[in-house]
Amino acid sequence: MEGQNTVLSVVGPLATNAASLRLVTQALLQQEPWLHDPLVHEIPWRADQESEIKSAKKLCFGVLRTDGIVNPHPPVSRAVEMVVKALRSAGHEVIDWQPPSHRTINDTGFNSWIYDAGKDVRSAFALSGEPMAPQVSFYQSLEKEYTASEIAAINVEVRRLKKEYMEYWNSTVNKTGTGRPVDAIICPLAPFPAARKEKYKYYGYSTWVNTLDYTSVVVPVTNADKSVDKKDEGYKAIDEQDKRTQDDYDPEIYDGAHVSVQLVGRRLQEEKMLAVAEYVGGLLHA
């Protein structure tokens, strides 16, 4: 949304491996984009962040297996555990990540996308006449536009949430055994593998990253396997939203689908997280 500065949009490049992502990021920074876009930070490529990871004898990761709102499908849970196992086998530490509520973060971030009652989204669709997918059709019925005071209050809340999460992250220095807070977080990218058409109904595993302005790199891990990733027929849902997501899981349909996880770092840690992603990818696919 033009003029919405609470949670800014970014371009997320895609590549077949982390080394290619590093190359394209370096190439972009060499063009000094801060001379062309006033919102770009004037920060050239920082090789020290990259070398810090490559020279570390031991890293520590936090693992978020579920956000407590919507639990991941079996293939996604298995992928997270594969990453945990690979890191521990390589001598690194993995601790449980028990952060402040992601629900509050997600709800606050979502509110920033509807400041204008959906006018920007509807005008974009009107240019082509393309119908809205069911997942975003709610933009057609929004009526309330946020006032300046309401937007300011949300901005204050986002700042509070960032500080709260930062303080939790800092506190992990007492749990890691490395003398540093957790280096990165391992968590699902979405509760499902590669999404089925019109089934991408929950965005919470990426919304919190965007709202806090953190750095995330997605790493491919495995493929769904119907012989392993069985549906839990006795599953007890958290609520109706979680139930709908779990009901959508079908081992036969998802069989062979790509499954990824995301590795999350703090603000402005692109070089560091690309190095982490390259290392983790190497462990998984050695």
Regions of interest found by a model, annotated:
Residues 1-45:
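A short core secondary-structure module
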Residues 9-16, 142-144, 262-265:
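Short, well-ordered beta-strand elements within core beta-sheets of diverse protein domains
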Residues 21-24, 140, 263:
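Buried hydrophobic packing segments
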Residues 27-211, 221-253, 268-272, 279-286:
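Amidase signature
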Residues 216-220:
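Short hydrophobic alpha-helical runs that function as membrane-insertion/retention elements
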Residues 259:
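Glycine-rich phosphate/pyrophosphate-binding loop shared by adenosine-nucleotide-utilizing enzymes
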